[in-house]
Amino acid sequence: MAYRILTLSPGSTSTKVAVFEGEKTVMKSNVRHDPAELAGFDFARDQLQYRIDTVKAELAAAGVDLASIDAYSGYCGGMGPTVGGIFAIDQTVCDHVLNCGMNHPAILGAPILYQFAQETGKPAFAVNQPDTDELDDVARITGYPGVYRKSHVHCLNQKECAIRYADSLGKRYDEVNVIVAHVGGGLSVAAHRHGRMVDTNDVLEGSGPFAPNRSGDVPAKPVAQLAFSGEHSKQEVMGVIGKTGGLLGLLGTDDAIAINERIDAGDAWAKLVYEAMAYQTAKQIGAFAAALEGKVDGIVMTGGVSNDEGFVAYVERKVGWIAPVVAYGGDFEMEGAAAGAVRALEGTEDVMTYTGEPSWDGFHLDGAFADVEA
């Protein structure tokens, strides 16, 4: 049976909507919202009914009846750290995300899907939600007391690509070790060991390779000196770390196509900077090969920049000796959400009940809780 699955992903200025039926894409669109309309809402949570109405209008325009949908799935922000996998979206999930203190439309994913599920009597699922945290304890330690690493990566696309690669080997995701590098606006690399992301960089907190618009790892002292110099506000420093650093800060654009055009025209600085991003990506992959003790079945490049054959080829030259390198250019979040819903409906993957309890709340050593803040 080919299930019909509706998926969605609410973003800052748009909402992605897609409907899949088996291998067929019934519809897929990115609905742009009028900035003037968005400006009328004080908080992201206040946009809930507006986004519901917008999605319904888009579905109606595409001739899709909600009654034809077998299940709902999508990008569900605000759930906090959990293990990866599939969670049933219920009132507990919705209450948590709407009151989590996060002021970003990503928190509306679960409530929108739940509303549709309530209206039609069909299930709704959160698949590999963005705050998934499966790090090994040893990967959390830093040398700065009180600062511990957490996992913030492109989890839905990361895991979907790892699953696809495992399928290509005729194996299950929990049977392989894979390193996935998502290179888009942000850049996340993760070591997947037998179905768990046991080590990652953190695209929100500013670690790992620099990205098209994020700074990545930088020397700590110079940043501290900048922060306390009185010449830069907290917002300015945080902005470079998370929004205006990386390629954008160094080259004035985060468009890989435009940068390659500059390189082709002889721009030596653009070439060096772009190569440095590939170099750092390869270094992170190499580090995670060590985390997997060299037992790596494959390296997957994904995200928009992974459509650039030159970028992928550079990384492959650096790390191809570790394991085969394949590129799945673009992102597969919508497809991954749909595939997860199908696995839930078919019973090939367990569906978990969300409790709101974090997957990591500190270190538990010999039965004792280490006195740290999660």
Name each region found by the language model.
Residues 239-294:
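Adenine-nucleotide phosphate-binding core of ATP-dependent small-molecule kinases
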Residues 309, 313-339:
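Conserved phosphate-binding/catalytic loops in two-lobed NTP-binding clefts
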Residues 327-374:
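Structural signal for terminal/edge beta-strands and the immediately following C-terminal loop/tail
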Residues 296-315:
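Glycine-rich phosphate-binding loops at beta-strand->alpha-helix junctions
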Residues 5-46:
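Short glycine-rich, Thr/Ser-proximal phosphate-binding strand/loop in the N-terminal lobe
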Residues 59-105, 123, 131-142:
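Short beta-strand-loop/turn "lid" adjacent to the catalytic site in phosphate-handling enzymes
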Residues 109-114, 126, 141, 146-177, ...:
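Glycine-rich phosphate-binding loop plus the immediately following alpha-helix
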Residues 57-70, 168-172, 285-297:
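Phosphate/pyrophosphate-binding loops at sites that engage ATP/ADP/AMP, CoA/4′-phosphopantetheine
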